[in-house]
Amino acid sequence: MNSPLRRLSTPTLLSLAVALGLSGCAGLPDQRLANEALKNGDTALAEQNYRQLADLGYSDAQVGLADIQVNTRDPALLKQAEATYRAAAQTSPRAQSRLGRLLAVKPDATEAEHREAEELLKKAFANGESGTLIPLAMLYLQYPHTFPEVNAQQKISQWRAAGYPEAGLAQVLLYRTQGTYAEHLDEVESICKQALSATDICYVELATVYQTRGQTEQQAALIAQLRSAHAAGRVNAQRVDSVARVLGDSTIGTPDEKTAQQLLEEVAPGYPISWVTLAKLLYDFPELGDVNKMMEYLNNGRAADQPRAELLLGRLYYEGKWVPADAVKAEEHLKKATATEISAHYYLGQIYRRGYLGQVYPQKAVDELLTAARGGQNSADFALAQLFSQGKGTLPDPVNAWVFAQLSLASETPQATELAQAMSTQLPPEKLATAKDLLAREQKVRGASATQNAMAMQALQEEKDGEEAL
């Protein structure tokens, strides 16, 4: 790293020297402390130290600060992160890599930004930066029209033939993106067994493989290995949380919710996000605890400023399952989660659409549901189609009803199919051309599917977590 001291003025150097002389190391920003705090989920302490070092000109600390902003997934903070990466990229190859990775998953990015991302990632890869092939592969997979000259599978095969360590994981990502993961479990297992010691995201992939197959002995051995690696500091709490989510996922083979709960309770005191994961696990498996346990988990998560805790608490008041239904409290908690949690917009939209606050608020419902739909919540398209077809609180709009009914087909549910057929019947023939044009425009606004964007953002996060500390 280029020494930031060379770029500081004499008065600044003098002030820094005086501070060092008067206080020694006590109270001074500490990058190692920031790294450890971030690894353990204490983003406030990490941000405090990174920010102070970043203000002194340390490019690695600037990158660390931007990483925290990226982790929030808050649109406003993502813009700040992009600006921070750009500023640091003038002297830091790591920042160049981060900028490329962020542009690769940036919502509503332009074709020029995607091309810039490719250039930055290729440059970073040539400079030996890790974590570049996964977002590069995602670029090619998500935006084939921008890169018509690139065949993603051929490119990944070339990387694997050249022996690049990340290439195997790029292949796994391709299977996930194309929906063929279940057809390649043997290959995923082989790739991740070889890469496990170097890339801990493979704990998640192997847990998925073993749970899908129902291989309980292999799963138990993997969990024991994970616990040992975490105790030794080789695997962070976030990875343990990710594995626990697989164990508690009822859509993947036969879940092991009790082991998931044990893992999460082990790491939650030092990794507050896991309190919310515990609450969601209890929501899915009520036999694991009672309402008091649920509130304990959620209050711990809220105390650590976790938006997902606000989302889940709002959902509880919305549904009236664990606590008495209360639309006012639901709205209050859901609003606190909207900056980072797309689902919060969906539930708010439903509150306004269904009149849970005493009357229907059609425009508020449309605004919230459209935000949710464009963020990847397929059920929001279905709700919008219902709103425009039923005309509850507003006049029926058969054109908009048809458009959102067509978009809701992505959820592949019988209800969506039935609604789409009904809307096609009700749409006047002379308005079909207008409806198709509106559908095309809405699809263009959404660009790459939000599900893929979410997957890409997750890939960015997972790859970054696998790197060495800044």
From Swiss-Prot:
It comes from the Bacteria. Its main location: membrane. GO terms for cellular component: cell outer membrane. It comes from Pseudomonas syringae pv. tomato (strain ATCC BAA-871 / DC3000). It is found in: Cell outer membrane. It is a lipid-anchor. Keywords: Alginate biosynthesis, Cell outer membrane, Lipoprotein, Membrane, Palmitate, Signal. Pathway: Glycan biosynthesis; alginate biosynthesis. PROSITE patterns: PROKAR_LIPOPROTEIN. A lipid is attached at C25 (S-diacylglycerol cysteine). May be involved in the polymerization of mannuronate to alginate. Belongs to the AlgK family. This is Alginate biosynthesis protein AlgK. A lipid is attached at C25 (N-palmitoyl cysteine). InterPro entries: Alginate_biosynth_AlgK, Sel1-like, Sel1_AlgK, TPR-like_helical_dom_sf. The keyword Signal applies. GO terms for biological process: alginic acid biosynthetic process. Residues 1-24 form the signal peptide.
